[in-house]
Curated annotation (Swiss-Prot):
InterPro entries: Tachy_Neuro_lke_CS. PROSITE patterns: TACHYKININ (PS00267). It comes from Octopus vulgaris (Common octopus). The modification Methionine amide is found at residue 49. The lineage of its organism: Eukaryota, Metazoa, Spiralia, Lophotrochozoa, Mollusca. Residues 61-87 are annotated as: Disordered. Residues 23-37, 52-87 form a propeptide. This is Tachykinin-1. One of its GO terms (cellular component) is extracellular region. Expressed in the posterior salivary gland and more specifically in the mucus-secreting gland cells. Residues 73-87 have a biased composition (Basic residues). GO terms for biological process: neuropeptide signaling pathway.
Length: 87
């Protein structure tokens, strides 16, 4: 009879512990869900045409873009052992 009481007591304590940890998880989830995050600005929602226009504007403003570097030709060959001086 005492063993049955101990088993039921352990089950009750485990249930209470499980319920309290579930409440903590819900609280953490609600805090994450309600965290103060700034809503995205309207400039972040650019249509596909707007993105292409913005991209071409960036390429024109920055002359070191990939289109410019591809016109320069292949890269120069560099010695694999720069510490050896050529005579």
């Amino acid at each position: 009879m005492i063993r049955v009481g101990l088993i039921l007591c352990c089950i009750f304590i485990a249930g209470v512990f499980e319920a309290s940890s579930a409440d903590d998880m819900l609280t953490a989830h609600n805090l994450i869900k309600r965290s103060e995050v700034k809503p995205p600005s309207s400039s972040e929602f650019i249509g596909l045409m707007g993105r292409s226009e913005e991209l071409t504007r960036r390429l024109i403003q920055h002359p070191g873009s990939m289109s410019e570097t591809s016109k320069r030709g292949p890269p120069k060959k560099v010695s694999r052992r720069p510490y050896i001086l050529k005579k």
